Each structure stands twice: as C-alpha cells, then as structure tokens.
A protein has these predicted regions:
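N-terminal secretory signal peptides and thylakoid transit peptides that target proteins
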Residues: 1-24
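Short, conserved catalytic-motif segment at the N-terminal edge
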Residues: 38-97, 117-119, 133-140, 421
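Short, surface-exposed loop or secondary-structure junction motifs
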Residues: 72-75, 135-371
C-alpha cells in the first residue's frame, strides 16, 4: 500500500465514517485514565482500511487494538459480528484466536521457569516419560518405518516447533494421516466424548507415532505447544487450564479469555466464515465452529489453539509482555522473564519462516525491516504482535478461514505505521 492510497483512504474515511462503528476511548497503562481519544482521531488510516473491507463485504466486521508508544490503548472497529445480523463488533467482542493461544502457553511456561520448576533445555521425557523411547520416521513422505531418535527432545524444542512433532493439518503424508486416525486434532471443538480424552491421552498416542525429524534438526509447525501444556500441568502439579488462569489470565485481567463459552457469551462471538478459491463467491458460515460447538464441555485443553479472547484482553496480554511483565500495577512476571519470552531461542543454525522463534511466537531477526518484532497469528486471520524497538503492540481480530483468505493485514500494517508515525527502512 503506497502513501497515495493511504491519503485516498483518509479522504474516504472522513467522507463516510458515519456508516461504521468507530472506537471508544483510549486508556493509559498503569490503571490511570487517559483523556478520551477517538480511534478516528488517532488511527484514521487504519480505521479507513477496516471500513473499506467491511463496505466491500470482504469481511462482516473487524476489530483492532493498539498500545501506542505513549502508553495509551486505542481501539478501532468496523462492521458486525455476522453478515446477517446488526450486532456491532467492538473491543469486547469474542473471537476464536486459535494459534494465538500458543503465546499464552509460552508465557505460562516462562513463569514456571521463573519459579524454578522448569528449564529451557530440560528433556521432555523427564516430565512426560511416555516420550522416553521416541522414534523418527526414516522416510516420513513414504511411510511410518522408523528408527530410535538420536537426539533428546527438550522444552526448547517444544517452544520453537523443532521437536520433530507435526500437525494433522500440515500435509497429507503418512505421519499426518496417523495423527488424524488417532484423533490428534487439538484446538478443534469436539463433543462430550472425544476420541482423545485429555492431554495425558494425547501424549500417549503421540508417543506411538514416529517423529518426522530428529528433535532440534528442523522447524516443523506442530502440536508441540499442546504437549507443552501437559509439561506445565505435570511440572506444576496444577491442571494446565488452572495454571494459565491463575498465573496469566487473572493477573493480566483477561476476564473474557476462556476455553469454552460461558452463559451469555454466545451473543458476543463473531461468526467464522470460510472463503473458497473463487473470491467472487460469497463466504459460508462454518457450522462446525459455531457458538454451540464452543459451549460444549471440554476435557482436552489445547495450549496450541483452544482459547477464545477479545481485542481488549489480548491487547492487555501483549502490552504486559511489552511492559516488561507488568500489567497496570500488577507484576505478572519478572522483566527478564518477559525479555526471555521474546528472545530468539531457536537451535543454532535453524530459521523459522525466515526468522527466529521465541516462546511460541515468531521473531524478526536483525536486518529485517521489522527487526525485534515478536508475535503470532491464528487460523481465522487473527494476529497479535509487539514491537519493543518502537514501543507498541497491536492485535487484529477477524474470523476468516483459511488463514489470509482475506488479507487485510498487508494493508493494515502500513496504515498503522503511518498513523503512529513509524518509519521503516525497506
């Protein structure tokens, strides 16, 4: 998006802003109230991007939250929760954040390390003995023939997707098919009697399926953050969702971040839409991801993709990491722990999608135009990131599948930079 387009978007916004729901006030970190600031006044170019995507019916609605360099929180929004309803999207609307759950799980592991109950290079098998005799597929593209693993899987490997584990959705090879046949699809809503009962059951099933690579040898996006949930549970002696609630969600003030919808939450949950290859065809609502599906009881808590959250809540979480582990007046973790979370801990010689990797999230390495940025995304197009060098955090909430089916992010990012006065070197 070039500067002329941004200026044109500003004109479009000023002419037609009244047709869309704009943001409320901004608040300052540390619990102190800020003067009321309209999102239109602070983020006019970003607001125009949201407005245009909704006006063109590419999305029913979108919500963005920004922790600005001056410490204020700014929320902008456009549209509704569904193409067929008139309930407006807002900072407290609810979204399935899928893999953005991974950053929360990574933070939970970090505070457990701060407690002295876990270390980065501890062998996973010391905590999950089911993993004591892992095997590696000799040719994962051809079959499940395997040999004993030569390398030891560690907590670092789980955090950075270098464990040798994979995802059922990461292709259609023999190993991925074995995951599907075993019911290892964490993060997806399921009935009251799922094939995989809980994290212990998942680990036992994973131990019987070969790894697709030696631990520490390659980056492969995977269920490793789900396995990390079991590590946290066993190392802490506290059920994984309870540990996350006590050590991350409660102190940050993430009151609307849940594993299952509570009574009354369904009215705030945005509909997920699936987009086909024919972009001219209207998207369809995904029935399998309905509010009803997310209200059912759950026994398998997915640290890799199970949370529902709001723009306000997730921005609060990102702001805590940006603010060296402090959420308002509450100390959630030590500054050095917050720094560790956003430190590149990939095994030497590896890259992850062209960059580094921290505690569950991607890191822009030196030389990248977004050097130092840390964050991750969700399957339905949600995105969250912090930029410590430029002192801001941001999150985008939409519900469009598959990921990047509606590529609003490529236009929103330069608009946010322009609104915040950030100049990047190409």
């Amino acid at each position: 998006m070039d500067r002329n387009r941004l200026i044109a978007d500003r004109r479009t916004l000023l002419l037609g802003a009244g047709a869309f729901g704009l943001s409320g006030c901004a608040t300052f970190g540390g619990g102190a109230a800020a003067p009321e600031v309209r999102g239109l006044e602070r983020l006019p170019l970003s607001q125009s991007v949201l407005n245009r995507f909704v006006a063109e019916r590419r999305l029913p609605g979108a919500s963005v939250g920004v922790r600005a360099p001056d410490g204020s929180d700014i929320f902008i929004r456009a549209g509704t929760l569904d193409f067929n309803v008139f309930d407006r999207v807002g900072p407290d609307s609810l979204f399935r954040i899928f893999s953005m759950t991974k950053l929360v799980t990574g933070a939970a592991a970090a505070v457990l390390m701060e407690d002295g109950r876990l270390t980065l290079d501890a062998p996973v098998a010391e905590i999950i003995p089911e993993f004591a005799a892992l095997k590696v597929a000799t040719n994962p593209a051809q079959g499940l023939a395997a040999r004993p693993a030569r390398n030891t899987m560690t907590i670092r490997h789980l955090l950075t997707h270098t464990s040798g584990l994979t995802y059922s959705i990461a292709g259609d090879g023999p190993v991925q098919r074995a995951y599907r046949e075993a019911g290892i699809t964490p993060g997806a809503p399921r009935g009251d009697d799922p094939q995989v009962r809980d994290l212990d059951d998942m680990a036992a099933r994973l131990a019987d399926i070969p790894l697709i690579a030696e631990p520490g040898a390659a980056y492969n996006y995977s269920v490793s953050l789900d396995v990390l949930g079991l590590v946290i549970q066993r190392a802490s002696g506290v059920a994984f969702p309870d540990f996350v609630q006590r050590r991350i969600l409660n102190p940050v003030g993430m009151d609307d971040t849940v594993w299952r919808l509570r009574e009354g939450d369904a009215a705030r949950l945005m509909q997920v839409y699936a987009y086909g290859r024919d972009r001219a065809a209207p998207p369809t609502a995904v029935a399998a991801l309905s509010a009803e599906a997310y209200a059912r009881p759950v026994t398998l808590y997915s640290g890799g993709g199970g949370l529902i959250s709001s723009t306000r809540d997730y921005l609060g979480f990102l702001s805590m990491l940006l603010n060296d582990g402090r959420a308002g007046r509450v100390r959630v973790m030590k500054p050095e722990t917050a720094h560790l979370i956003r430190t590149d801990i990939l095994p030497e010689g590896l890259t992850a999608e062209g960059g580094g990797f921290g505690f569950g999230g991607w890191i822009a390495r030196p030389g990248h135009r977004r050097q130092g940025e840390f964050g991750w995304s969700g399957a339905a197009g949600t995105q969250g990131w912090i930029d410590p060098e430029r002192n801001f955090a941001a999150t985008l909430m939409i519900q469009a599948m598959p990921y990047r089916a509606v590529d609003i992010l490529s236009e929103l990012r330069p608009a946010l930079d322009a609104d915040l006065g950030i100049v990047r070197i190409a």
